[in-house]
């Protein structure tokens, strides 16, 4: 839920909504902007259900700044020996995001994580059939040829 609050603040969509609406086998790199072995490596099934992998560089930078700012805020409160219930912790996120003039997620979002994962994996199954596979052998040959020229 915490992650969704930040994703929603930056994109207007929860993590599941980002994955569900962005995973598309017909798009270059299946709609991903980054993945474990990017930019030249193979896209893995585990890459396609990570919402952050679909965000633009600008959105990633905003997300990182916002999360970092929130952690600084919480660390300051903890150093002053404030304690929180989970409900208070959740509300503190809303207060922080509201102060930063972001929209606040109400509820859990429209798409479940299970539905997003199911769609992303179905898209990946078809996309994976078209992925170009470069073997280690081919990669080594290419490097050797480059050295000899």
PLM features per residue range, with description:
Residues 1-149:
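Positively charged, phosphate-engaging catalytic surfaces used for nucleic-acid and nucleotide handling
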């Amino acid at each position: 839920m915490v992650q969704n609050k930040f994703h929603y603040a930056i994109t207007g969509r929860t993590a599941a909504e980002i994955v569900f609406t962005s995973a598309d086998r017909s798009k270059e790199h299946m709609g991903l902007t980054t993945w474990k072995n990017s930019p030249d490596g193979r896209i893995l099934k585990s890459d396609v259900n990570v919402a952050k992998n679909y965000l633009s560089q600008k959105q990633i930078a905003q997300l990182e700044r916002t999360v970092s700012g929130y952690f600084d805020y919480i660390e300051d409160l903890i150093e002053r020996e404030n304690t929180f219930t989970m409900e208070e912790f959740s509300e503190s996120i809303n207060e922080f995001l509201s102060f930063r003039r972001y929209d606040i997620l109400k509820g859990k979002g429209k798409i479940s994580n299970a539905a997003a994962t199911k769609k992303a994996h179905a898209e990946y199954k078809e996309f994976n059939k078209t992925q170009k596979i470069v073997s280690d052998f081919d990669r080594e040959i290419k490097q050797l040829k480059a050295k000899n020229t």
